[in-house]
Amino acid sequence: MPGEIQFTVNGKPSAITGDHPHLLSALRDELNLTSPKDGCSPSGQCGCCTVLIDGKAVVACQQSVDACEGREITTLEGLPESERQQFADAFAACGGLQCGFCIPGIVMRAHYQISKKGSSLTRESMAPHLGAHLCRCTGYVKILDAIEAVAHGTPVEPPTVKSGVGARGMKY
C-alpha cells in the first residue's frame, strides 16, 4: 500500500500509513481501536468486526483499507457514551451476553437497524440481520430481547451482584 490513506474514524481525521490486509487490521493494529474483534478474518463469517462505513453496517475484515479513503468509519468507541451504556444495561439485564466477544459487532448492527427503523424495529425484523453474527455462548433470544429493549426505549434495571467469594451469584 503506497502512501497514506486518510479517512474519518469516530469523528476524527485519521491516516493509515502501514500495510494492512484489511480495515480490521488497520483499526486494531495501527489505530488501537479494539472493539472490532477478529473472530474469523478474512472470511467475514462471524460479524465480530462489524463497523459502520458511511453509516452502513459492514464487516471490517472484508474491507480493503484503500476502499475506505475519504470515508466515515464508526466503531463502538465512536457511539455516544449514553448509547453504549443503554446497550450495556440492556444486554446485562436481559442476559444477552456471556463472554462478550461478539457483542461489539452485534451492537453496531443493532445501532444501524435502530437508526433506520427506530422504535418500529421488531425482533422479527431484527432476527435476520443477526444471521451475519455468530454467538457461540448465549444464543440469540436474549440478544434479541436486549436489542428490542433498546429500540423501544424500555427501561431496564441492570442486575446488581452483592456477593463475595464462595457466595451464590445471581443467575439471569
Language model feature labels by segment:
Residues 1-172:
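Signature of N-terminal electron-transfer/Fe-S-associated modules in redox systems
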